[in-house]
């Protein structure tokens, strides 16, 4: 049964979750049963929902894995149905490399990256139509967007009736045996996952194990992708600063086990030929990045003084004092090393110590920032931030779109079950077996390219902390990387998009005028960086072949801090029904709850919100210093009018 609403718009799918009523029946999907395991299958549909370029194919589908009582030592009594969206390259897909894209969270859907950052289309402000993205990452690369771990986005364990509150951005399991409640502005109904935190991966390494199983099935048995180029890259963002190193190193370790015949099971012996790991605004390791949560709001290149000297000093003290953040992190890591060396998160004592470390550091580092009323993902924007636009949530709520996708579930941008599961074991406080910086070093030693790319307006995983990670790596090229200077990233004949330090296969780039979701702010710059890395060109100019010059290093200044930025105009406020918790004022939320809000295409027209105050700045003008690039965003016109801060799950 499907329901419609009797307001100014048809009520959508569950927004930060999902549901325009229930999805239509799944029809017309192709089913491929595994030749290795009768209980494994792939279901998919070809469609042109987002990629409309003539002759360029795209597919949505699921890889279905049954419960497993010995998943590399982890008992898993739930099914995994992992959603993917595959776009062939617009140019020569048969010979193009492939990149996986993963958003972070933990628990955030990769549809964020697809529709707000680097996919083939932008969603217009009617939440129904699309505009071609000329800077799409599938221009020359086959792109595979994956919703993971289980229950994220369109991925699910078991189909479950749910309701969704637009007011507090929460999904609830529902019992509709006595009838389905009518939908209204504040309550939507639909189909989702079980919401059971025990029915998903509970840490980064277990997520790596699951995604490796997905990859074994997809790359061997998905019939629509049979390339001549077998190179695979992973690009990720935010909490992907942990996903990326862990997943890529796990893939590489499994490759070694396949080669030395440690792994001999049929169907699990496909080599995943890793080429590149790219991390955008990654939260990688708190030991390297913790101090940046005090430094960035206090002293940044935009002259925004969100913190006083007293607040800055207090946070630094909480990091270093006895039983402070660093002490708790060290205790967690020592306990994990002794009590859970394989990262199964099945030791209650270790979980409790690490959960305490994670929550304590979060309190010390991030709670003070809430008082600033500035954006977590863009320090130059207000907390209720409408950029990048959330229009894709309404787009994915359309019955026609869900039908074309062949999805049995409504869209869920953030999986609460995943967040609970990861936070409950203190995943963010502890590294994996090698450590995430150790993983990056291992990948570099294995010949894998690694690129760290950071927008310079993001607070939550800011570039100052990212730079510290880059300088803290210990690998054979460490000294040469440190000696390299920062060079301009030349995007075109008239625009410099950032500064890069690069030596050989490793690079750190600061992208000007960009928040957390860098490609959403600077599509052209991001595409240039992405393609240069993918095709072995130097990031600064794109003219040198790094494969032929393995000792190449950039020259320039030791720091980038001398390059200052102008504060951009604050975006016009836009209250979007499906992102109400992150874009609407208290007055607007009240009107939504009472059913008095005037809504058009999911946008609250009345009551209207007023633009907030500009961020606080220093009294010293930075005009004497060089100015970064141009203050104008490169985002297309269709995106400039309205945008969104997705609800602060943890990281996107």
Swiss-Prot record:
It is found in: Cell membrane. Residues 1-19 form the signal peptide. PROSITE patterns: CARBOXYPEPT_SER_SER (PS00131). Gene3D superfamilies: 1.10.287.410, alpha/beta hydrolase. This is Carboxypeptidase S1 homolog A. It catalyses: Preferential release of a C-terminal arginine or lysine residue. A lipid is attached at residue 629 (GPI-anchor amidated glycine). Keywords: Carboxypeptidase, Cell membrane, Disulfide bond, Glycoprotein, GPI-anchor, Hydrolase, Lipoprotein, Membrane, Protease, Signal, Virulence. Belongs to the peptidase S10 family. Its EC number is 3.4.16.6. GO terms for biological process: proteolysis. The lineage of its organism: Eukaryota, Fungi, Dikarya, Ascomycota, Pezizomycotina. Glycans are attached at residues 77, 132, 161, 168, 184, 202, 260, 299, 347, 410, 474, 492, 505. GO terms for cellular component: fungal-type vacuole; plasma membrane; side of membrane. The keyword Oxidoreductase does not apply. Residues 630-652 form a propeptide. InterPro entries: AB_hydrolase_fold, Peptidase_S10, Ser_caboxypep_ser_AS. It is a lipid-anchor; GPI-anchor. GO terms for molecular function: serine-type carboxypeptidase activity. Residues 618-627 have a biased composition (Low complexity). Disulfide bonds join 50-121, 325-361, 332-354. The gene is SCPA. The active site is at 238, 458, 516. Substrate binds at residues 461, 517. It comes from the Eukaryota. Residues 607-627 are annotated as: Disordered. It comes from Trichophyton equinum. Extracellular serine carboxypeptidase that contributes to pathogenicity.
């Amino acid at each position: 049964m499907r329901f419609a609403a009797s307001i100014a718009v048809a009520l959508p799918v569950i927004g930060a979750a999902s549901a325009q009523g229930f999805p239509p029946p799944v029809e017309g999907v192709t089913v491929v049963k595994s030749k290795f395991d009768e209980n494994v299958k792939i279901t998919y549909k070809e469609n042109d929902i987002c990629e409309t370029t003539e002759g360029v194919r795209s597919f949505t589908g699921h890889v279905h894995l049954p419960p497993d009582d010995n998943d590399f030592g982890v008992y898993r009594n739930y099914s995994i149905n992992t959603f993917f969206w595959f776009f062939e390259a617009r140019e020569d897909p048969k010979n193009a490399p492939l990149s996986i894209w993963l958003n972070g969270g933990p628990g955030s859907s990769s549809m964020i990256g697809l529709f707000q950052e680097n996919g083939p289309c932008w969603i217009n402000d009617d939440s129904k139509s699309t505009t071609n993205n000329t800077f799409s990452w599938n221009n020359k690369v086959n792109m595979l967007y994956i919703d993971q771990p289980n229950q994220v986005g369109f991925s699910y364990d078991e189909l479950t009736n749910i309701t969704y509150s637009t007011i507090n951005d929460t999904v609830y399991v529902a019992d509709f045996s006595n009838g389905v409640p009518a939908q209204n502005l504040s309550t939507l109904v639909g189909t989702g996952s079980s919401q059971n935190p025990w029915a998903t991966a509970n840490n980064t390494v277990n997520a790596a194990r699951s995604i490796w199983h997905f990859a074994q099935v997809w790359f061997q048995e998905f019939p629509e992708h049979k390339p001549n180029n077998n190179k695979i890259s992973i690009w990720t963002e935010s909490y992907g600063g942990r996903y990326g190193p862990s997943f890529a190193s796990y893939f590489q370790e499994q490759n070694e086990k396949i080669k030395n015949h440690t792994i001999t099971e049929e169907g699990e012996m496909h080599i995943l030929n890793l080429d590149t790991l790219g991390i955008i605004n990654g939260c990688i390791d708190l030991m390297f990045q913790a101090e940046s949560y005090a430094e960035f709001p206090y002293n940044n290149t935009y002259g925004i003084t969100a913190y006083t000297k007293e607040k800055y000093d207090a946070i630094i003290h909480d990091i270093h004092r006895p039983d402070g953040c660093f002490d708790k992190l060290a205790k967690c890591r020592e306990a994990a090393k002794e009590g859970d060396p394989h990262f199964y998160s099945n030791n209650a004592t270790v979980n409790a110590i690490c959960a305490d470390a994670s929550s304590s550091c979060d309190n010390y580092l991030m709670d003070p920032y809430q008082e600033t009323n500035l954006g977590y993902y863009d320090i130059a924007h207000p907390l209720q931030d409408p950029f990048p636009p959330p229009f894709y949530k309404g787009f994915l709520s359309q019955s026609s779109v869900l039908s074309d996708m062949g999805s049995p579930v409504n869209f869920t941008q953030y999986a609460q079950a995943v967040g609970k599961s990861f936070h409950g074991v203190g995943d963010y406080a502890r590294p994996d077996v090698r450590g995430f910086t150790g993983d990056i070093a291992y990948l570099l030693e294995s010949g894998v390219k690694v690129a760290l790319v950071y927008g310079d307006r993001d607070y939550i995983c800011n570039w100052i902390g990212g730079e510290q990670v880059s300088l803290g790596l210990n690998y054979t090229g460490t000294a040469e990387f440190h000696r390299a200077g920062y060079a301009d990233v030349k995007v075109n004949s008239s625009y410099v998009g950032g500064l890069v330090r690069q030596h050989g296969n490793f690079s750190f780039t600061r992208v000007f005028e960009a928040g957390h979701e860098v490609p959403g702010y600077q599509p052209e710059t991001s595409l240039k960086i992405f393609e240069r890395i993918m095709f072995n060109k130097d990031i600064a100019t794109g003219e040198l072949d790094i494969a032929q010059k393995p000792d190449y290093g950039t020259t320039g200044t030791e720091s980038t801090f001398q390059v200052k930025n102008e504060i951009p105009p604050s975006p016009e406020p836009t209250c979007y029904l499906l992102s109400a918790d992150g874009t609407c004022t208290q007055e607007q939320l009240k009107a939504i709850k009472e059913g008095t809000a005037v809504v058009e295409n999911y946008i609250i027209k009345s009551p209207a919100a007023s633009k907030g105050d500009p961020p606080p700045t220093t009294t010293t003008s930075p005009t004497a210093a060089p100015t970064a690039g141009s203050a104008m965003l490169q985002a297309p016109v269709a995106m400039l009018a309205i945008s969104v801060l997705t609800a602060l799950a943890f990281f996107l």
